[in-house]
């Protein structure tokens, strides 16, 4: 299976993504697992350190108030979606697994109608990308009950070293 992980910017998005990748790889070392990221997120260090390829795409931050960045948003988003589609085509992606953050929205839009999307929301209050992405897929998991209506509550993916603490 060829899996494209989309979650970046902060460790809160990246760690659950990498922990999921580790579990998938443990279950089947033949899985082709790649991650999306931006050049300014923590994923630039964390993803390669865990042994996964990282594909960089343009960041598309959502302006919090009307300004010039809001005018540029549609063209930036289109460019980022195109970059994700290029990665998906190169990899032959079978599924996009998203965890929120700057890279998740373009990934969800690129995958919509092409490959299945699986979303995990680790926060009690979901971010914009996961709220929008959850409309595109029935496969939504959450760490906290009632974060996203209809999502299955599964907790947060943890590293095996943490799970096995005494």
Locate each region found by the language model:
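Conserved nucleotide-sugar phosphate-binding/catalytic loop shared by glycosyltransferases and other
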Residues: 3-6, 11, 30-85, 154-155
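Residue-level detector of alpha-helix initiation sites
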Residues: 10-11, 101-103, 124, 128
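Short helix-capping segments at alpha-helix termini
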Residues: 1, 25-30, 113-114
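Glycosyltransferases and closely related glycan-assembly transferases
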Residues: 83-96, 104-118, 131-136
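Short amphipathic alpha-helix
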Residues: 13-25
């Amino acid at each position: 299976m060829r899996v494209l992980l989309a979650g970046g910017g902060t460790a809160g998005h990246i760690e659950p993504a990498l922990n999921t990748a580790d579990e998938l790889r443990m279950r089947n070392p033949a899985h082709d697992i790649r991650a999306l990221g931006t050049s300014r997120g923590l994923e630039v260090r964390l993803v390669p350190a865990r042994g996964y390829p990282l594909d960089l795409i343009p960041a598309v931050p959502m302006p919090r108030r009307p300004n010039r960045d809001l005018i540029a948003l549609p063209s930036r988003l289109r460019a980022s979606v195109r970059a994700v589609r290029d990665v998906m085509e190169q990899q032959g992606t079978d599924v996009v697994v998203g965890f929120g953050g700057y890279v998740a929205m373009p990934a969800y839009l690129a995958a919509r109608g092409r490959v299945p999307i699986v979303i995990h929301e680790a926060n009690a209050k979901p971010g914009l990308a996961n709220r929008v992405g959850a409309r595109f897929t029935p496969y939504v998991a959450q760490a906290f009950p009632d974060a996203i209506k209809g999502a299955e509550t599964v907790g947060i993916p943890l590293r095996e070293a943490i799970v096995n603490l005494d």
